Amino acid sequence: SLGLYLAESLGPDPRMAEIIVERVQSLGLSNETESPTNEERGPTGVLVVKAGTKNQYDDCLWFQDLGRMVENRLGLGYAVAVAQSHYGDPTVDDAATRLVEERGVARIVVVPYLFFPGLILKRNILGGMDRIAQSHPTVSLSVTPPLGVDDRIVAVAADRIRQVWDRVEG
């Protein structure tokens, strides 16, 4: 008989957080935490955006955990929020507004939590950035490349598969 087994998601894995941090750092933005002007500018906002889901069971708690991991790794001078590109909460607009109004950011780096560029990136994420620019015209916006192909993602996926086999064979 054929058995179907569900593995855990990539979820809030430190390796995934590390990739996101590298995407932010790849832009070469200076984090001026020691600069006297930083008080006026506030921290750099990082908005990690995943594909939206209509799944009623995806409460995005795992994604919020991942966002906290990223903020802890980036350290002082950064404020991280997470959002869904469409269909669900938190929305790109709401998360960006929280970064600006509650965390005081003057710059937002958007990190697409996607494996490759495509329709979701073009229509939903970049479209969301257009809305952010209209709502918050003084906020500087930039976007990193998607996660792409990375050995750490492969390692996380392999770990999830091994966990399933361990349960099945154990």
Briefly describe each language-model feature range.
Residues 1-170:
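Extended amphipathic ligand-handling, pore-lining, and cofactor/metal-binding catalytic surfaces
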